[in-house]
Amino acid sequence: MLDLIQTRRDLHQIPEIGLEEFKTQAYLLDVIEKLTTGKDFVQIRTWRTGILVYLQGSQPERTIGWRTDIDGLPIVEQTGLPFASQHQGRMHACGHDFHMTIALGCLERALEEQPKNNLLFLFQPAEENEAGGMLMYEAGAFGDWLPDQFYGLHVRPDLKVGQIATNTHTLFAGTCEVKIRFKGKGGHAAFPHEANDALVAASYFVTQVQSVVSRNVNPIEGAVVTFGVFQAGTTNNVITDTAFLHGTIRALTQDMSLLVQKRVKTVAEGIAAAFDMEVEVELKQGGYLPVENNPALARELMDFFDEKDGIELIDIEPAMTGEDFGYLLSKVDGVMFWLGIDSPYALHHPQMSPKEEVLAIGVAAVSSFLKKKAAE
C-alpha cells in the first residue's frame, strides 16, 4: 500500500518549474508503473512532462477525469523541515505535492478492480506559469481519452482539516497579466518643454485606470485591476523616455474579464494620445479562465460530501485567485473544490506547510466519490 506521507515528502523535495518537471515526472511514472503492473485495463501516455493514466471501463458509458497539477514555484523554502526542497530557489509552496500524492492514492484505490466507466488521471504540468492544461488540450494530448466530466481539488490553508469547500458557480477568478510601456522623449530635468515625460503619463494612467472597476464594473459582480510594478527613470535630474507598468486583471466571468481588458487598453491609449506619445499594451490571459463549476455536477458532489462522515462541507464564495483548471472546465463539464489543510501560512508563502493527516482524508473522500462516478 502506498505510503502517502513518504510519497508527499519525496515529492516535496524535488519541486520544479512548469515544463521542467523532469524529476517529478520520473518519480510519478515509477510509482504509477508499480501500481499498474499486471493491470491490462490500464494505458499510460506522456506529453512533455505531463502524464495521462487511462483506466478502460468494463462497460463504459462515459469517461470521468481527475486532474492534479505537478509543478512547483520559484520560491526559497523557509519551513525548516527535514524534507525541505533540495532544489535551490524552488518550493512546493502551493500544495501541488499534496495534490499529486492524493491523486496517486486515488489511482491506487481505483486499480483495485476494473471500473465500469472509464477513468482518466491527469498529472498536469505548468499550472503556475504556462497554463499546462490549455497546452495539453491544444496539442491534442487527450485524444479519445478526453473526459466527459472533469474534477480536481486545491488545498486551502485557512480551512480546517476535514473541511471541503466549493459552490455551484465560480470558484476561481479568471486572471490576465498586463504589461504597459509608455514611450516619450527623454531630456534634462531643467528643460521639460524639450522632453515628453513618460513617467508623468504613466502616473496619470495609474490614477485614471482606477475608474475602470469603480465605473465600468457592476459592483455586484466585482473585478480587480492591480499594478504591482512601476519602473521609470534612473536618476533624479533626467526626464525618462519610458515607463513600464506590470499588473493583473481578475474577474469572475470571462465576459467581465474581456470588458476590463478592453477598458484598460483604451485608457492607456487615451493617455498616450493626450501626452502625444506611444504606448505598448500587452494583455496575456492564455488559459487562466474563470473556474466555473457545472451547477448540476457541483450540487451532486456537494451532496455526496455533505453525507460523508468526517467531512464538513462549506458552500464558499469565489476567490479572486487564479487556476488554469478553468480552461479545461471551459471545454468539459466539471467541478473543482477546496480541501482544508489548516496552515498558518498562505499559499505561495515560503513557510507554507500543510498538515499531513489531510492526505488520508483527501484520498478517502476523493476515491469514494470517483468510485461512485465510475460505477454509475
Swiss-Prot record:
EC number annotated for this UniProt entry: 3.5.1.47
SUPFAM superfamilies on file: Bacterial exopeptidase dimerisation domain, Zn-dependent exopeptidases
Key word Hydrolase present: yes
Keyword tags: Amino-acid biosynthesis, Diaminopimelate biosynthesis, Hydrolase, Lysine biosynthesis
Enzyme category, top tier: hydrolase
Classification via Gene3D superfamilies: 3.30.70.360, Zn peptidases (3.40.630.10)
This protein's record includes keyword Disulfide bond: no
Active site (record annotation): 69, 128
Name of this protein: N-acetyldiaminopimelate deacetylase
